[in-house]
Amino acid sequence: MVKSIIFDFGGVIMTLDHGRAIGRFQQLGLKDAANILDPYTQGGIFGALEVGAASPEQFKSALSEMCGRDISYDECRWGWLGYAKDVPKRNITMLKRLRREGYRLIMLSNTNPYMMSWARSSDFSRGLDDDEPQGAGVEHYFDAIYPSYEVRVMKPDIRFFQHVLSSENINPEETLFVDDGPRNIEVAATTGMRTFLPINGVDWTEPLIHLLNNCKAEKHL
């Protein structure tokens, strides 16, 4: 029986737009953005930011050097937020439903301070939550959040999954991991967690409920 659900952020809760992010960084002057940016796991200074090895200020300085001009904090944030196509209202509704039904909800994400400055603000769900007309940050919808830059490890490193399972003191066999990255799903499954692989931008809410109902039925077999 599933008691806890661990969600990825980008590609699950938030619809990712990798192409738009590339376009924005190219506009900032990063001509090779298409070869530098990755949909799942960043490398170079982008990866250093997401694993907590570089601060936002260090990232800004490095990006300025790569672009050949001074890049501001707001421009860095604008570039990163190119990834955030939208947050479907149905996803917010589903998170609230799952918590009402007693599931412990956890977010585990390869992300960075620029993205989380938006995600943790009321802009995250403004206009999407009828109970929060002014909007609420992502932490309002989860019991715990683990950004890669705070944990200092990125998926698909198994240590990320092990850290969350240990910190939350949850049984992997009673935990469902939801992620749009096949490699992340593959590694997470080795911990004993159940897994669900939705497709970025496709409605996963009803398939998830179907999966959870099947898990409940297994208990009674």
Language-model segments: residues:
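Anion (oxyanion) recognition and catalysis
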Residues: 99-100, 189
